Amino acid sequence: MNHLIIRQLGIQPYERIWHQMQDFTDQRDEHSADEIWLVQHPAVFTQGSAGKSEHLLTSSHIPVVQTDRGGQITYHGEGQQIMYVLIDIKRLKAQGKDISVRELVTALEQCVVRTLEDYGIDGYPKPDAPGVYIEGKKICSLGLRIRKGCSFHGLAFNVNMDLTPFSHINPCGYAGLEMTQLKDYISEDNAQCKLVASKLVAHFCNILGYNSQKITNKSEIQAV
C-alpha cells in the first residue's frame, strides 16, 4: 500500500519552505512516507538552476531568490496554489511502477489538466515548455529537483491572484508569455485555492496510485 502525507501549510515564506524541503529530502530514508505540501507564498521571484539574469526585466520591491529547482524565473504570490511533491521515485520503481522524472512531470501536468476539466476548462501541456496552458496562456508552472532519487519542489497553479508582477519577468524564460488564472474563467467565489488544492491532490493520487492518505494541519483536503 502506498502511503501519502498531505500537509496544509497556509501562507509561508518561500525560503523557509524551500530549506525545509531540502532538509526533509536529505534526512528521509526508505521508510519515510511520501508527502505533498500545500502552501502559498508571499510575493517572491524564484530563479531556477538554469535561470538567466536577463529574464528579470525590471527591478521592483519583490525579492529574488536563487533556488535549486529546474527551470527559469517565475513569480509566486498569494492566491497561487503551490503543490510541492516529495516523492521517493526510486521506491516507486522498486514497487514495479513505470515512473521516471519525465513521467512525474507528466503526472503533475495531468493532475492540473484534470482539475481544469472539473471546471469545464480545456487546459493542455506543451512538450517543449513544461506547464499547463489555456489558449496559449500559462496557468501553471512546474519545476522539480531530484536528490537521492527523491523529488522536491513541484507546481504553481494561478487561482485568484495579482498577475501584474509577471510583467517584470520573462515567465519561465519565455519573452512575451502571457499568464492567466482560474478566476478569469469561472466565478470568483469558486476560484478558491482550497478547492483547487483538493482537486489537485485527488487527481495526483489517482494518477500515481496512492491509496492511503494522512492529512495534517487541519487540512480541508478530502481523502480519495
Curated annotation (Swiss-Prot):
Q: In which pathway does it act?
A: Protein modification; protein lipoylation via endogenous pathway; protein N(6)-(lipoyl)lysine from octanoyl-[acyl-carrier-protein]: step 1/2
Molecular function terms from GO = lipoyl(octanoyl) transferase activity
* UniProt keyword Acyltransferase, yes or no: yes
Q: Where is the active site?
A: 172
Binding-site list for substrate: 69-76, 141-143, 154-156
Chief location? cytoplasm
- A cellular component term (GO) from this record? cytoplasm
Matching entries from PROSITE patterns are given as:
BPL_LPL_CATALYTIC, LIPB
Q: Name one GO biological process term.
A: protein modification process
Disulfides per UniProt: none
UniProt name for this protein = Octanoyltransferase
Q: What species is given as this protein's source?
A: Haemophilus ducreyi (strain 35000HP / ATCC 700724)
Q: Which gene encodes it?
A: lipB
